[in-house]
Amino acid sequence: MRSQYCGALNASHINQEVTLCGWVDRRRDHGGVIFIDLRDREGIVQVVFDPDGKDNFALADKVRGEYVLQVTGKVRARAAATVNPNMATGEIEVYGTALTILNEAQTIPFPLDSYANVGEDVRLKYRFLDLRRTEMQNNLRFRGKVTSAIRNYLDRHGFLDVETPILTRATPEGARDYLVPSRTHDGKFFALPQSPQLFKQLLMVAGYDRYYQIAKCFRDEDLRADRQPEFTQIDIETSFMSQDQIMAVTEGMFRELFKDLMNIEFEEIRHMPFSEAIAKYGSDKPDMRIPLELVDIKDLVTDVDFKVFAGPANDPKARVTALKVPGGNEKLTRKQIDDYTKFVGIYGAKGLAYIKVNDKSDLEEGLQSPIVKNLPVPVRAAILERVGADNGDLIFFGADKHKVVTEALGALRCKLGADLNLYTAQWAPLWVVDFPMFEEDDKGGWTSIHHPFTSPSCTPEELVANPGAALSRAYDLVLNGVELGGGSVRIHSPAMQQAVFKILGISPEEQREKFGFLLDALSYGAPPHGGLAFGLDRLVMLMVGASSIRDVIAFPKTQSAACVMTDAPGTVDELQLRELHIRLRNQKKEQPAADAPEYGM
């Protein structure tokens, strides 16, 4: 139906006859000459119809926005005065000699202009129109280039693309599963995979050595800007490779991706222990573009007559920390400080103490703060020295339980970086390593930091003796404060796997019921293996500069995990429910389509 794409035409096509197909982006009637901007996925070209072609001109006069056209004409150079430098095809136009209206279009509910202020709910309701916008077209085309480049890299490095099951069984991986009732197995359910984790490990046991998959995964969890109930991850697993080797081959892929697609070259990516990330940046995914650090001052305030500091300073589970903002005296108003005090309250902080350094040589009168009178002069001097304060700086303080201070000041650090535009680079990748194996839950038990298949850096006996001290052989790749993904060396010994299950409170009976197939596989000569997974949606979101992963997914769900275009999830008829042996409990007469039904057997 066509000979060229609209956006692919250029001066080399002058005097050639072409046939184009596309949508009407804009139509203009200038003194008896009709101009139509015809759009396809490659771009826009101007088509001209004049009264000399009587039938075509009459037809062009009927054309409206978003009509679908087929146009035949001759490419010609534009007059110098009409060249449009803002269009890739701005030097040429097509003089139309034939026109066919392939389909008409109703008036669209919102303009497709890139700068149109359209609510996201409307965009998602008419996603098939929203996807026509240049921004969305560019995002999805770029996403395709990313997946193609990843496949090419992994293929070259000997990885095999293997699909794993979508219908599987529920396993504890940290989030709620999406369950699928079985019609043929009364009372039983499949689960949609949160990741291909166990299957890719089994492929290593089976001897496939290097596996990858662009995998669809599902998690029934609360949504944020960078979360979706169904998402895509770049899943990788290898055998007979050390942690450093796995990280190196992955880093090579990451660096090649940015160089080839964005002309950005990264130096070797820094490795940072988890403990340093938490201590200095208040996060296990620190944004290294921000030149602010948390500084612990607990030892300096243990004996002060100021309970706000002294209490946490003498509590082994608490933390007293300073965060210096260079030049903060002039940059931050009292109202902003009050706003930041409210902000840290989101993370459980009871307040936000601060000191303004007006003259550090005068420790009596040169410091401005509601709390400074509670700190002896030697303590003031020690704090200024430790944080490296200069005149004009402002120092924030956090004093509370370790988790509260870490999260509150870590978040404040990121907010200050954004609000004051403190970024020192456009991109800052980082490997975070040496994670703890476990963390304590609210009931005093242990939960896995990553997942229960991560290998520790110690023996099973040492692990059981002191779970809280054990470090894992895990690693996360962080970019600009966003966790792109992570992985670990896996457990390949049945004894070690059973030791981890025991620490997590999984009984031998439950181990056999839920993980018997894995324990069996590990007992039949499982090789040392490890891998990782990247969130493709998050990666593309960062690379194109989108504010949400919904802008890099063709048909995403809303913040409430619904599709407003198809009204999914929806109700099903009684016959289907009976076939699945399901009865709805507390069913409403008119249940909104976006509400998930509550299942009861």
Swiss-Prot record:
The organism's superkingdom is given as Bacteria
Q: For this entry, list what GO says about its biological process.
A: aspartyl-tRNA aminoacylation
**EC number(s) of the enzyme?**
6.1.1.23
Keyword Membrane attributed: no
* UniProt keyword annotations, A-Z: Aminoacyl-tRNA synthetase, ATP-binding, Cytoplasm, Ligase, Nucleotide-binding, Protein biosynthesis
One of the entry's Gene Ontology molecular-function terms is:
aspartate-tRNA(Asn) ligase activity
Q: Where is the site labelled Important for tRNA non-discrimination? A: H30
Q: Where in the cell is it found?
A: Cytoplasm
Q: Which family does it belong to?
A: Belongs to the class-II aminoacyl-tRNA synthetase family. Type 1 subfamily.
Q: What interactions and quaternary structure are annotated?
A: Homodimer.
- UniProt-recorded name of the protein: Aspartate--tRNA(Asp/Asn) ligase
